[in-house]
Amino acid sequence: MKVTVDQAFWDLFPTARITVMSLYGIDNTVDEAKDPYFKELLDKGAKRAWEFIDEENYTQSEFVQEWRQAFSKFKTKKGARSSIEALLKRVHQGREFYPINPLVDLYNSVSMAYALPCGGEDMDKLVGGLSLGQAKGGEPFFPLGAEEDAPALEGEIIYYDQEGAVCRCLNWREAQRTMLTEDTKDAILVIEAINLSLIHI
């Protein structure tokens, strides 16, 4: 499947790096009672995440500040924060992470271990390829559990396909329509970096 990054994104973030991995024919199920591998992976990611957190105030982390600055460069929904900030906040609060499904657990553990936003979509649910760019405004978006449309704002940075927004505010919230589930067979995973000097891989 074709993945496109529009020039409007590069105009805002000329030093960014968007890494994409395509997976085909996968089994996205696991019996956690018999195989606790993904719970252990999440625990390891959360433990390593402390390397990127100020014990007194997680918001002072340079990784959190980096993404807050990035979000200030485009139109966002009030209160929207990057996915990595949400994960680091949960770690700082001492909250436990429980498995969702193997692919989601994998990208969440990588995200915490390296302080990089990671995400993924069900390739078979995308229509006409995946793009990252600036919203025209009004692209339909239904997050998990929502019954009402929460369309993208004009100028917002979003992932989108021919049917609408796939992930809003770059990496803030994804659509239920294309999210990874245990039924997913083909998937696209994405890792985002805005400031290459902060990559710890």
Locate the predicted segments by residue.
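Conserved small/polar residues in nucleotide/adenosyl-binding loops
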Residues: 199-201
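Class I SAM-dependent methyltransferase SAM-binding "motif I" and its flanking Rossmann-like core
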Residues: 111-138, 156
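A structural-propensity feature for long, helix-poor, extended segments
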Residues: 135-167
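Gly/serine-rich nucleotide phosphate-binding loop at the start of the catalytic core
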Residues: 2, 9-44
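Conserved phosphate/anionic-ligand binding catalytic regions in large, soluble enzymes, centered on
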Residues: 96-120
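Glycine/proline-rich, flexible active-site/cofactor-binding loop segments
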Residues: 33-87, 92
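A generic local secondary-structure boundary/capping motif
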Residues: 7-11, 98-101, 122, 144-149, ...
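Conserved alpha/beta core surface patches that mediate binding of polyanionic ligands
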Residues: 1-5, 160-179
